Regions:
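Core catalytic lobe of class I
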Residues: 1-93
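S-adenosyl-L-methionine
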Residues: 107-117
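Conserved SAM/SAH-binding beta-strand->alpha-helix loop
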Residues: 96
């Protein structure tokens, strides 16, 4: 490739539902979102851009549903879920106690913002 590099990456997504799953919109196999930059990594070095989680919660989660993030880090999916008009519940799992504290603080901020509006 004459000194050029090619990188191909993907992330797995499991969609679980009770009964028949009926999406509100088609989920494409590629989601185009901005890449993470330094502004997206304010809370955690592996923090992801918020655009993809917001999109996924919007099209996949029913009103009052449940969003589970088994490797939640600083809770980007949790912030997206709690900020959504769908009002889903959120369960996040994280092993690192320091990162759990960061996630809890971010989720509390979203809760405070929602309560103020």
């Amino acid at each position: 490739m004459h000194g050029r590099q090619v990188h191909n990456g993907h992330r797995d997504l499991l969609v679980l539902s009770k009964g028949a799953y009926v999406p509100r919109r088609w989920l494409r196999d590629t989601i185009k979102t901005p890449l993470s930059d330094a502004a997206d990594k304010l809370h955690h070095p592996w923090q992801q851009a918020a655009a993809a989680p917001r999109y996924l919660v919007d099209i996949l989660c029913p009103d009052g549903g449940l969003v589970l993030d088994p490797c939640c880090g600083s809770a980007t999916f949790g912030v997206a879920a709690l900020s959504s008009q769908r009002r889903p519940r959120f369960v996040g799992v994280e092993l690192d106690p320091a990162v759990v504290a960061i996630a809890a603080e971010r989720l509390a901020q979203v809760g405070n913002e929602e309560g103020a509006s």
